[in-house]
């Protein structure tokens, strides 16, 4: 199965709170370019999409959803910037085991996206993600590990 991890698009620097920072126009266009490239690789359907509740992540998903079919979309409070990567990885693994998902997308933030990638790919140093960056991991729920299939950067 494939786990896609995407960092939200570029966001405004200031807002009432970090959670309320909105996407910039550049953030939206870069996210759309990455989504289009992913769909062109043949990955346009997700069994489940997990999205951070923060405005910029929600806006990223809303923008890119035009390129994808999503069976289920869940706003997940655990995938905010300082979410616990091991807990999120356990949750995702359980979802995959129970529902036999083939493609799952996570739209989240630094530093979580890097740490989460390292949870799924053994011996990988947590990578830095550019805004709108996406990684696809070919993941085995039985082996509880995966390998990077591809990266897409804006």
Model-inferred region functions:
Residues 2-3, 7-79, 83, 90, ...:
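Active-site-proximal alpha-helix that buttresses catalytic centers in soluble enzyme cores
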Residues 93, 114-121, 135:
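A broadly conserved amphipathic alpha-helix scaffold signal in soluble, globular proteins
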Residues 101-117:
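A glycine-rich beta-strand to alpha-helix segment
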Residues 121-147, 153-154:
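Domain-level recognition of soluble alpha/beta enzyme cores
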């Amino acid at each position: 199965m494939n786990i896609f991890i995407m960092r939200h698009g570029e966001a405004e620097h200031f807002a009432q709170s970090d959670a309320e920072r909105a996407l910039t126009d550049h953030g939206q266009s870069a996210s759309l370019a990455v989504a289009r490239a992913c769909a062109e690789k043949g990955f346009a359907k997700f069994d489940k999409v997990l999205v951070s509740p923060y405005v910029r992540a929600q806006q990223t998903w809303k923008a890119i959803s035009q390129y994808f079919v999503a069976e289920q979309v869940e706003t997940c409070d655990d995938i905010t910037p300082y979410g616990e990567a091991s807990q999120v990885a356990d949750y995702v693994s359980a979802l995959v085991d129970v529902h036999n998902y083939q493609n799952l997308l996570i739209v989240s933030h630094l530093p979580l996206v890097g740490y989460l990638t390292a949870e799924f790919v053994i011996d990988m140093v947590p990578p830095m993600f550019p805004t709108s960056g996406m990684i696809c991991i070919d993941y085995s729920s039985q082996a509880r590990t995966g390998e990077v299939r591809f990266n897409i950067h804006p």
